[in-house]
Amino acid sequence: VFEDGIKRLARVSDRERHVLNLVEELPDNAELPLHVTVASGFPKGDKLEWVAQKTTELGAAAIWAFPADWSVAKWDGKKLAKKAEKLEKIVLGAAKQSKRNRVPEVRLFEKKIDFLDCLSQFDRVIVAYEESAKEGESAALVKAVTELKKGSRILFVFGPEGGLSPAEIATLEEMGAILAGLGPRILRTETAPLYALSAVSVLTELLQ
């Protein structure tokens, strides 16, 4: 795993001083064509740790979390710092195991407004909305992903247990987010991000 996302072949020239000589850059690329960030409302227990590990394996570029209206978990600054440190270790291990070129960014927001202020940096924001799934909506996700060019930045927003509140949905829509169902079944807060990333992989890698 390298900071710039490029894998390289090197030869050890000095073991004591840990000096390497670059032999060549390798074309191997294990990253998704889209820069995908997953953002979850603070879930209960250790669900975020599980989400961080599995979404890293599936190609997420960043794992974010924020205090949603219906989040049961309440984390202050000190708890957030400790949680972030734990998550960073988890994603590093998962990135190595899955032979990623990059280690995903971990960012936990203490205030929801700070999270919302970051939405403008994305080319597309998709909100996983269970009401869309109940209504049988199935095209929004496919359309939103396939319209994007390679390298585009996409943000998926997921609610905690109980989902996002009507006020949050309204705010996200006002900010230009797209509401999308994730298939005909209602998914748990820790399962939905995996579905979304798998869909991105199928649409941008396997079907190309």
Question: Where would I find each of the regions flagged by the language model?
Answer:
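Generic structural signal for helix capping and beta-alpha/helix-loop junctions
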Residues: 72-73, 135, 189, 196
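Structured adenosyl-cofactor binding patch, chiefly the S-adenosyl-L-methionine
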Residues: 165-208
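Short beta-strand-centered aromatic/proline hotspots
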Residues: 7-15
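Short conserved beta-strand and strand-loop elements enriched in small hydrophobics
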Residues: 1-4
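Gly/Ser/Thr-rich beta-alpha loop segments that engage phosphate groups in nucleotides
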Residues: 43, 47, 161-165, 185
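Short, acidic/turn-prone active-site loops that include or flank metal/cofactor-
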Residues: 26, 132-133, 184-187
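Active-site/ligand-binding-proximal alpha/beta "capping" segment
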Residues: 125-163, 167-169, 177-181
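RNA substrate-binding interface of SAM-dependent RNA methyltransferases
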Residues: 14, 23-127
